[in-house]
Amino acid sequence: LKGMFSVLVDDPVSYVNAPVLARSRGVETALVTEGDSPDHRSMVRVRMACADGSSQVVAGTVFGARDSEKLVEIDGLDLDLPISEHMLVFAYEDKPGVVGVVGQVLGAAGINIANMQVCRGGGGALLALTVDSAVDSGTVDAIRLQINAVRGAAIDLE
């Protein structure tokens, strides 16, 4: 919570006041502990209620001696992607050619891809990328249209 609200509010955020900030903004939190996780020693899973009534789930973990942060799940699909300042996520019907289209559109916009992962499940696919610079909404929209994405978004954690 501290990390999430540190980038969202102007006031100082601490481990003590982060739960209070969350409640005051309508964010429900719960601490759930499980004995043994086969994959991660610790993991944070966030379920978000969207304005359109849908929900999304994102999970992340910290690993290694350097405490590297990575995404490990989006909407039930497993992935292993470093968290970066600039990221893109697209959900689409699994079909050939999507990776090429995304690479072409980003290349034409001068955006360098740092990491990319495709995950599949139930006929759908998720493409998650880290990129070297912010991606404008026009480029995100162009990708979304060309790959016929169900959802697509740029995430900037500056």
Where are these regions (language model features)?
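A conserved regulatory-domain signal marking ACT and ACT-like small-molecule sensing domains
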Residues: 1-158
